[in-house]
């Protein structure tokens, strides 16, 4: 047997002894200490005691050292391995030697073990003030005694006072620190409406002291980077106040208006370090950051956390942090308080999908606090990815509310002055970080400079800036593969309804993972959405045939940056689909997703190759025929449509279809070749497409027994049944059909560039103009403005024939009235 002398850290008084066998374990020693002091360690499990060998620099501490209390355990060896034998950790009978009687009488007898006692939580007995709720001073009477003069120890009482003196109530710093933090907040009404019912249920359950998880909603803001998660958390008090007002519960409304907000983050200044601050207490990663918000001097985060960790006698969990705030504000009962706890950047925590990982344990601790908090607490957590959240809560009935930041209406936060600016704002797809990036770029230039700037150069510079902001997308090996880009593009164009954890096409990428890159959204109806500017970068990476790259990239540039006639735009959109679905059988309804069709069940379309766009020089019949050798002539020569590699734009003012091409269908088990004809119809304001008008357009453009016919118009349409293989894209279907291309489609309805005001770069990018013609136009208009087409023809093309004359006829002149 060995006799060990022990003392409690932070407690002044005499040491006490326990008898154990030197072959016993550390766990046995904890049991012996607990048994020796049953009153002092009341309600504390033996395994929660922390033991240290009381030897510093090879010398035992003495009874005299511990009589006034010991607080500093720096440099002492902690006995952490519960199975370790006492003789193996320096506590054998041989090592723990006795001293003579005189040494003992003088108080110089050795103390072998120091005991650190974890503090009890939430003592709520009547008569116990707030200060004593966080360490039970009644169980340790010496804790209430003032420190003795000259003593170097810090009792829990002293640590408590020191901590309180270093803190004060402070409103949280904004989690969103970027340039968009002051933009008017959008979508508040919709979000508040989503919160009304769960907030009211949570409050009622808290008031009735019902801790059932199904009544207490954890609010989860889940969306990709740069979409407004941090901004939503900054706005959370306003959202909760709006929701409470709608609940018609006066007390709830008053509580939310007077709520204290804690905003903690695992990014920026208090970023996660790859491991929890305390493996045994995941709450500390939240509560320490809450207290950091209250710090008067705001020291370095790591230094602050280290200071809190040194207060071993104070168990500073989330409830304790709220109790400290109550003490600072002079609130006598925590139940009178309302707290909104916002936790940003959970995805930064270590996550391996297990219940022992940091992500799971921290989220679980927040939920545990939410369900049993003495104060009325609302908890909101954000992350860029949802799958680990679902895994963490998969076995729990915890009620959860998913909040998605709404797309921004870019023109409301970023005023524009030029046509290219307006288009670029649309291209950001309502993503906050993308709009901030664009705003910074545009701020360096005046309106005149922007109007003279090459749109191609401007677009590329904006893309370069976005690459820095969204590095994960552009550096990802996934997006280096052209076939992956094609699968993603097809997923967007198809308007297919995805579940969050569905895979994209034939890739291993899930919708949730794709969304976590940023610039992608998973819409409310399950559709995959993407900012147009990213869509352009995806299209640039599409697999293309040899010799087709320059042709497609030039076509893409003109479509993205230059005004085009509506039929030119629709032809490009159809071309993109031919590349996205190349060699992939797909339902005709999915190929033309968003359009309204008649009977097309069991019809599959296969694009055998990607297509190019050609323009016929004359008006051609667009109905299919048995003659597979039919050739049409454009400026580049003959075109054989039976090769199924072209989209033909018909000659000007054609009475038949505006676009046509030969397609391969499979109807049931039968393979069929026919024409696909697209008619682009612009109508005067308030005119509608009705059944008779539709039938006339179809009759002159398509073979009614075999061809696929699609009428595309921005006008409204009356309700009528469509014939088999016939489709309609009207005002009701327009946005669904064109998706992220919609703003480009609407732009084609605007008047063409004005010949007297268009910049050199705007003119040269018009199809068929080029540098020489653009320079000639600018030189002539500096002499005198062009009044009308006749004036331009006389001065630029005296013969009034040829390609240039046709191009000039498509421009806008001072005498023209805008024909929208």
Curated annotation (Swiss-Prot):
Signal peptide: 1-17
Recorded consequence of changing residue 769 to A: Does not affect accumulation in the host nucleus but fails to significantly promote plant susceptibility to P.capsici infection and to suppress callose deposition and ROS accumulation in N.benthamiana
Family: Belongs to the Crinkler effector family.
Motif Host nuclear localization signal positions after renumbering to this chain: 118-124
Cysteine disulfide partners in this protein: none
UniProt GO molecular function: DNA binding
Keywords for this protein: DNA-binding, Glycoprotein, Host nucleus, Secreted, Signal, Virulence
Family annotation (Pfam families): Crinkler, HHH_3
Annotated localization: Secreted; Host nucleus
Top-level taxonomy: Eukaryota, Sar, Stramenopiles, Oomycota, Peronosporales
Keyword Secreted: yes
SUPFAM superfamilies with a match to the protein in the record: RuvA domain 2-like
InterPro entries from the UniProt entry: Crinkler_N (IPR045379), RuvA_2-like (IPR010994)
Any one cellular-component term (Gene Ontology): host cell nucleus
Region (C-terminal DC effector domain): 125-820
Name of this chain's protein: Crinkler effector protein 108
Region (DWL domain) location: 58-111
